[in-house]
Amino acid sequence: MTHPARVVQIAANEVGYTEYPPGSNSTKYGEWYGMNHVPWCAIFVSYCLEQAGICLAIRTPKGFAYCPDGVRWFQYNTRWHSQPQVGDVVFYSWRGDGIADHVGIVESVNPDSSIISIEGNTAIDNDSNGGEVMRRRRDPWSFLGFGRPYIIAESVPTPPISQPQKEPEKQPEKAPTNSQQQPNQGTQTTPEYHTRLVNQLLGKEKVN
């Protein structure tokens, strides 16, 4: 199972969980994080990621409890996207002012660009502090952006195997032509032959 599918499955298993007592912000997620009795939508997301084996030390070794901290981390680490994918961390800005008010996990993307997300600390009448884990349908106007906590490995092309270079074949040496050959006078070298020939022509040496 891929990391995105694993995160979605873990979040889905939490649907229906409610804080107790109501209105207290007291949850098992807050106890796990070490910060209970506080708004817990971001803590819920951190919990689901950690349970899937993804520990993002955004604010603490366990993740983040404050939505803007998550936004800054994803943006700084170039994992911030404008279009959703399943398993993304979705940040909402209800007023459209660029400030994250709430966070959840994308479960599915609809053809009309809306999403189904699983969110902690929400309710039908209170989007950001409702005290329950729920599935919510959200429209694009509410999206601030999407953090992608998964590093997708890109295939690296295998370099071609270098073939050993063949040494150039040596060309056989051509035998000198008759015109290139010098007359052989015994064991005389070429300069000696020329010298004797000149002397013979000048009458300084008898011809054998």
For every predicted segment, state its role.
Residues 1-57, 159-164, 199-208:
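N-terminal capping segments
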Residues 2, 26-27, 56-70, 139, ...:
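Secondary-structure junction/capping motif
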Residues 8, 54-127:
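...with weaker cross-activation on analogous glycine-rich loops/strands in unrelated enzymes
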Residues 31, 39, 72, 79, ...:
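Residues in intrinsically disordered, low-complexity segments of regulatory proteins
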Residues 100-208:
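Aromatic- and glycine-rich peptidoglycan recognition patches
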